[in-house]
Every structure is written in C-alpha cells, then in structure tokens.
Amino acid sequence: MLAPTAIIGTSGAVIPRTIRYYGITSLLLYALLLLAIWATIASAGQRPWDALILATAPSIALVGTLNWDLLPVALLALAILAWSRERPWMCGVLVGLGAAAKLYPLLLLIALFVLAVRTRRFGGFTRAMLGAVGAWVAVNLPFAWLYPEGWRTFYDLSRDRGFDFGSLWLSLRFLGVPVDALDPSQAVAGLFGLLVVGIIALSLFAPMRPRLVQIMLLILIAFVVTNKVYSPQYALWLLPLVALARPRWRDVLIWQAGQAIYYVAVWLWLNKFTDADRSLDDRSYAIFVLIQVASQLYIAGLVIRDIWQPEHDPVRCGTTADPQGGEFNVERAEVSSKPTGVVA
C-alpha cells in the first residue's frame, strides 16, 4: 500500500530516490506475485481455491520485497502451468529464464526426468531440457561475453562461501558440532545428492506415480535445508509448490509459523553487528534456525506420506490424475519395480 505513495509522493514532498526505487520495485514484484497466483490457479485443476495459500501467506508480507525472488517464483509457476498444458518447449524456456534469475527452477528438470523414467515417456522431458538450456544460454551469454568477471561473481561466491546465516550447518556450529572440519561445498553437494537419490527412489517405487509438484517440492526442500545459506525470502520459493502439493491450511500455517519465527530471529541476530546489547546470541539463534528447518521437514514428511500412501493426498482424493502431470497423465501400463504392476 505504501508503494504508490513512495512513487508519486504526498503534498508535493520531494521523495528520495531510494524510496522511489523501493516503491517502483514493490509494484513490479507484486505484479509478479499476481502472475504467480494466476498461474497457480490455472494449474490447480478442480481446486483453484488452493492458490489462496500463495495469495495470503504471511511470508508474502514479511519477505515479498526483500529481494527479487518473486521473479523466479512467477516463472516457475508459469513453467508448471505450461507443462500441465502439454507445452514442454514453453515449460523449458520458462525454467531457463527462471534459472537465469535464481538457479533453483532447474530442479524442475530433475522431477520431470524422474517421471519420464517412471512412465517411459522422454519426449516432453527432452524438449523441456533443450528449451531450458537454450533460454538460459540466450540470457547469460551476452553478459558472460561482455562482462565475464561480473558474470562470474555469483558463481564464485556460491562456490567459495562458507556456512552462512540461516543454514543448518551454521546452527550446528553454534551448538558445538565440529562442522568446520568439512569442506562446505562437498558437504552440501554430498548431503543434497543423497537426499535427491532417496527422493528418486521413493518416486520410482511408490505404489502410484507421484505428482510432479510433490517431487519438485521434496527436491527443493532438500536444496534449501542443505544449502550453505538460508535467506528468509527462500520461503517464497516453496509457496506455489506447497499450495499445489499439500493444500491443507493447518499444515501450511504450521510451516509458515516456523518461517515467521525465523524471520524475527534472523533480524535480531543480525542486530549484533549494530547493537550487540539488543541482539540474539548465537546459541539461541541456532535453536530458531532448527525450528525453521523442522517446519520445512514437517511439510516434506507429509508429502512423503502422501506419495507412499496416496489415499492421504488431498488432491488425489477419488482420482489418480495429476493436475500438473501433462503428458505423464496419458494412461498406459507402467512396468513397476514392484512384484505387481500398476497403472500410472
């Protein structure tokens, strides 16, 4: 609501450039939020009201304007919509554009590959992958060519940074666990890789083909939980996926409560750099980080149960279809690794 005032001012007052910039940025970000909400409504099939989870989540008010993360959020939501409409090329292009803003939309390709293996339908996945690579290269190549040092900065930082604020690793250090003996990049890659292998195994051996957003949500939770850093706005990444994968208000509110608690804790902890007497100590901060991690794992645990016991899945109640399944919804006999075959 402050954005229009920040742009045009009141009573002829001169508005500082920083406030004007914030106002314009906020309007653009909330336009992207509306786009993400529309895409979620369109992707939700017979449950369009599930998009209210995205529209009304406390995280939108708390961290919606903290960074430009609503851009990849909107692009990933559009990519899922494109896949649900059986437009793999468009899905891939949107994934590539999203990955140019934040790398995490690329994780959707892992989920698509898993379902391609399970259904033995690789055509759509191949087109989506090519579209993603092409779009990412088209956006990044000019900057990598003209400004190579600036372009590499993000990737160098991601490679070289240690365990940073909000991460499980930093909280373990504050609690006395000797994580400093680990190489940060190797530790993160190793643990994330193990979790992804587990998610793939779950998806391939589940009694019914998992839904696309269920697999994507599990992979993304594994990514943010094991990452070197956890910024408060990362909760935005999960919102459309939670709305589509686990649309139960009780569970969403439990998860959002954990995120809100962490939001308060991280600013209190960071306050030690300006006012140490009014800040949160390291050990207390670590406890709040673990609460945030537990809220993510709570959602992940419910989704795992929904995959292994589909009767608990609120979206699949009375049906086997996946609203976002796209070409994977084409019925065919699936050769299962279980003793008895099932129909995807």
Task: Show where each model-derived region lies.
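Transmembrane-helix motifs of polytopic, lipid-linked glycan transferases
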Residues: 11-47, 76, 195-203
